Amino acid sequence: MTLTKHEQDILLKELGPHVDTPAHIVETGLGAYHALFTAHPQYIIHFSRLEGHTIENVMQSEGIKHYARTLTEAIVHMLKEISNDAEVKKIAAQYGKDHTSRKVTKDEFMSGEPIFTKYFQNLVKDAEGKAAVEKFLKHVFPMMAAEI
């Protein structure tokens, strides 16, 4: 189920301060990946730019900044386009295909959804916004996973 315009507006407003500058975009993505790798450090090996890193040093690597930026940009792009189902599917498909070269299984990919949901909910203060985060990620994650 997709977001209503009202839910989209809440999320864009609440996430705005976290994605308003290139530095904030990277910082937001770093937080999401920190949450993912804390829960699943074994996933680090799936990222070519993180080769040789461990949970102890991955967050200081240059490679993680690339992944942090692209994750946040993809989420914001899908959120902004949520009323355009064809565009969201296109973005989700590309993001999902990007994971095929990482040898990520659908189950591994989907295991990130509750982690990212919790992380992004912590960035949102409004209870309605927290529910919208969950609704949004539960909508787009399966679309991305379908391409893996």
UniProtKB/Swiss-Prot annotation:
One of its GO terms (molecular function) is heme binding. Residues 2-148 form the Globin domain. Keywords: Heme, Iron, Metal-binding, Oxygen transport, Transport. The keyword Heme applies. Heme binds at H99. Transmembrane segments: none annotated. It holds the Pfam family Globin. The keyword Cytoplasm does not apply. This globin lacks one of the heme-binding histidine residues found in most other globins (replaced by a tyrosine) but has an extreme oxygen-avidity and high oxidation resistance despite this change. Oxygen binding protein. Monomer. Belongs to the globin family. This is Globin-3. It comes from Paramphistomum epiclitum.
